[in-house]
Amino acid sequence: AIIDYDAGNLKSVEKALKSLNQEVIVSRDSSEILQADKVILPGVGAFGDAMNNLDKFGLVDTIKEVTRKNTPFLGICLGLQLLFDKSDETPGAEGLGILKGEILRIPPKEGLKIPHMGWNSIEIKPQAKLFKDIPNQSYVYFVHSYYLKAQDEQIVAASTEYSTHIHASVESGNVFACQF
């Protein structure tokens, strides 16, 4: 199931999965999401607005339940950021708190534009399940102004450099997430 919370790249994620011959539902119905064998939280937008929408549609507890019951879960872009405690983008707004860490603004650096838009190579940790059979230093496409600083380095599956060290992907049990 792809979670529909009025924020995100739903159609591009749906199209990508269909091109891989996957059965796809796009839903904000908690019972449908809880019955799915895999769940994706996509995202493009602002942290605070996205959390408000998840709350408005009654999806906060649904997402927490999905991640607790061992269903494979993937957060993409803003979907990664929402899994954590808080974001500098919306001070005072609480994230889902499923994983520990914070979302920080990419610091300005001469010669680098923010938002970060473009291809960067990622340093893949050898134990990363999500990137099995993907070569280290592969290039992925980023569009973001905020980055993850995970509290526990053990959950970091891949990282990159852009003005600072960025935790680009994380894995914890059945929960996977990528900033790209």
Regions found by a protein language model. Name each.
Residues Q151-D152, T160-F180:
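A glycine-centered loop/beta-turn motif at secondary-structure junctions
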Residues A36:
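An anion/phosphate-binding loop that grips the pyrophosphate of nucleotide cofactors and donors
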Residues G45-G118:
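Cysteine-nucleophile active-site neighborhood
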Residues A1-Q22, F180:
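N-terminal beta1-alpha1 ligand-phosphate binding loop
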Residues V24-V26, I103:
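Generic structural signal for residues in well-ordered beta-strands
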Residues E32-I33, V66, S169:
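Structural alpha-helical scaffold elements that stabilize or flank donor/cofactor-binding regions
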Residues K86-Y162:
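Pocket-forming structural segment of enzyme catalytic cores
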